[in-house]
């Protein structure tokens, strides 16, 4: 076991957490500059935690297929959708991890593992993470470098650390500790915590598609956006505005993953449409927080306009960093060693 003392958390934080989010989207700070120049040498934030040895087309241009078993029970399926959306937003974790743009899916891509994850000061070999690092946690930091392999949450349940048997109720406190202690995150709403446990339990190796990976593109991310927004609608209808706000945050996070790949000057029009869509989501979040009567209508209206938005984004996808050739050019600029 490598028990080297690690670098101080503040030293790492200053270098890794400098880029800022505005309106839920990762925005270039230099107006009018080209995509690569505006975002320095890491136009896609995920490049900051991908090993230099990784195949960019696989690590940044595709994702593992999701092994999610959707139950016949509509109530349980709705809980799973809440957890699925929360799993994909940095708002859940908060703290330094949230400010770095990290969420559960950063390490567990589509609920799986991430063999290419290499976060400076947190990882040892690619695909490992030190969950007791004081950069992310003031509660569990132990001052010792001890990264462990990232588990595949869709692997055999018997190989996972915590029992997922619902009657044993071991998974919920474990996830709560991960959020509030391991990542210094805010207290999750009861529905979010319950949903996360339901989502993790629904990840099943028997539900894995025949195709191991799928291309990452506008269609996949917009599907995630709509699922999160439908979960927001359901939570708002039930009177749980706080959980609905988290669902909208997840939708905004997925739009952000599209936005950062549309930074080329030629994509100004679809990028403007993205920013307008994000502005309308921010308005819906505000309405939910204020318990305004127009919140449900704002959510409904956003979903109604999501189809034309996707059409416009698809039209520009070949000129974006979803294009494997352009992605490879961008990646050659920088990957951490």
Locate the predicted segments by residue.
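Sensor of tandemly repeated, compositionally biased sequence architecture
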Residues: 11, 31-32
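Bacterial N-terminal signal peptides that target proteins for export
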Residues: 5-21
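Bacterial N-terminal signal peptides
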Residues: 18-31
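Periplasmic c-type cytochrome electron-transfer domains
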Residues: 4-6, 32-337
């Amino acid at each position: 076991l490598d028990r080297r003392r690690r670098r101080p958390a503040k030293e790492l934080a200053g270098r890794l957490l400098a880029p800022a989010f505005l309106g839920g989207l990762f925005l270039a700070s230099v107006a009018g500059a080209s995509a690569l120049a505006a975002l320095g040498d890491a136009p896609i934030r995920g490049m900051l935690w991908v090993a230099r040895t990784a195949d960019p087309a696989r690590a940044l241009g595709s994702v593992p297929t999701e092994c999610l078993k959707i139950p016949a029970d509509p109530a349980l399926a709705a809980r799973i959708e809440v957890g699925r959306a929360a799993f994909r937003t940095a708002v859940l974790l908060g703290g330094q991890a949230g400010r770095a743009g990290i969420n559960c899916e950063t390490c567990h891509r589509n609920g799986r593992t991430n063999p290419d994850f290499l976060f400076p000061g947190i990882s040892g070999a690619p695909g490992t993470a030190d969950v007791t690092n004081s950069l992310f946690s003031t509660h569990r930091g132990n001052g010792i470098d001890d990264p462990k392999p990232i588990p595949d949450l869709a692997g055999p349940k018997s190989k996972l650390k915590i029992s997922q048997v619902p009657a044993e109720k071991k998974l919920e406190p474990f996830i709560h500790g991960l959020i509030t202690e391991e990542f210094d995150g805010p207290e999750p709403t009861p529905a979010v915590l319950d949903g996360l446990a339901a989502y993790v339990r629904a990840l099943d190796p028997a539900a894995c598609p025949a195709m191991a990976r799928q291309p990452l593109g506008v269609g996949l991310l917009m599907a995630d956006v709509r699922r999160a927004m439908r979960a927001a609608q359901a939570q708002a209808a039930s009177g749980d505005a706080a959980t609905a706000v988290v669902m909208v945050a997840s939708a905004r996070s997925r739009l952000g993953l599209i936005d950062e790949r549309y930074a080329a000057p030629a994509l100004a029009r679809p990028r403007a449409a993205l920013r307008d869509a994000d502005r309308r989501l921010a308005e819906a979040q505000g309405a939910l927080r204020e318990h305004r009567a127009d919140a449900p209508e704002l959510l409904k209206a956003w979903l109604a306009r999501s189809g034309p938005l996707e059409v416009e984004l698809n039209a520009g996808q070949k000129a974006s960093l979803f294009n494997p050739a352009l992605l490879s050019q961008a990646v050659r600029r920088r990957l951490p060693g």
